[in-house]
Amino acid sequence: MRILYHHRIASKDGQITHIEEMVDALRALGPVVEIVGPDVHIADTGQGGSAGWVGRLKKTLPGVLYELAEAGYSLVAYRRLRAAIRAFGPDVIYERYALYQPAGVWASRRTGIPLLLEVNAPYALARRKYNQLRLGWLADSFERYTFRGADRVFPVTQVLGDMLVAMGVQVGRIRVIPNGINPKAFEALPSTEAAKACRGLADRLVVGFIGFVREWDQLDRIVDWLAARPARDPATLMVVGDGPVRPALEAQARRLGIAHKLVFTGVVPRHEVPAHAMAFDIALQTALVPYASPLCLFEYMAMGKAILAPDQPNHHEVLRRGIDCDMYDPHAPGGVESRLDALVADAALRGRLGQGSRQALTDRAYVWEGNARRVAQAATELARSSAPAR
């Protein structure tokens, strides 16, 4: 089995982690995998950020021109993809969906090679929500065309799968494959106590968050919650990562007199993230879009952390309230704060939820190897069915 993996990622964050882990897992199963993507060099800086020239384009070009440039890049991507097909001779094309990126569909229709499409988000909807879309009609058209043109579509949640069906994708073409973890990355980690001690947090109760913090994560609410607690309360917010709202959060903490209760590690290499996050007593999953499958959620499970997550459908696909997580209403005033109060006050509950989250990960096999097996199986089926026509 020969798989040509096509993507348009130019950042070193959870997206590239997904690509690297899936490719490694596929190769470990036997398929030969070739990757084709943008010609950019990205250092292993951890979470967040875009390659320099991409970031500059986003900042300097007006929105309409940037989106036209995205659409225009699909022609470049198509030529690269066709060249890779000629050189590599794949049995299938595996593409990570990106907005304004129909190159995989074009190549598949031109060559007869089946296309497997991984979908992490309906990006036209996502960018429209945050006012980052100017050519909505064009984006919607590209998106529907790409989704409907794939032979197999792999959404990361059933919520997203249902959205694809509403866009016209045939149910029989959809296979839900959530994110996962590489168990080897979570071997030989320090204990929670040791991880705290290494970071000067030995006497703290750590509420933790992994990621590139943005405004919609609403960590300002957590800072306010910390400030409202007694002065000698040990609760502390630790962010393993960085983000554009870090200066505002740090200024808020200083203004409230709790600067010592807010800890940012800054950007760290991805392979070092688990060792830092082992300091968490409570792992916070912030309110995201209802179709996402956040990588950090599975990382929290692998570390056996007490998870506090928003009560929304995509999380119910993975977690069970009171068994392997606690949940809060992301829309209710005081929703996350009241559940944090309960978890801080109940060490036994934190222990039970942490054990439950680790067991759930094991029982349901949220690992890259399992995901790769499902992709390889679909690839084999499609390659066999298309062979006579090629």
Task: List each model region and its residues.
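Conserved donor-binding/catalytic core segment of Leloir-type glycosyltransferases
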Residues: 4, 201-226, 238
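Membrane-proximal helix-turn-helix segments that form the acceptor-binding/catalytic region
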Residues: 79-83, 102, 106-109, 134-155
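Nucleotide-activated donor-binding/catalytic signature segment of Leloir-type glycosyltransferases, i.e.
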Residues: 247-271
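A short, well-ordered alpha-helix in the C-terminal region of glycosyltransferases
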Residues: 342, 349-364
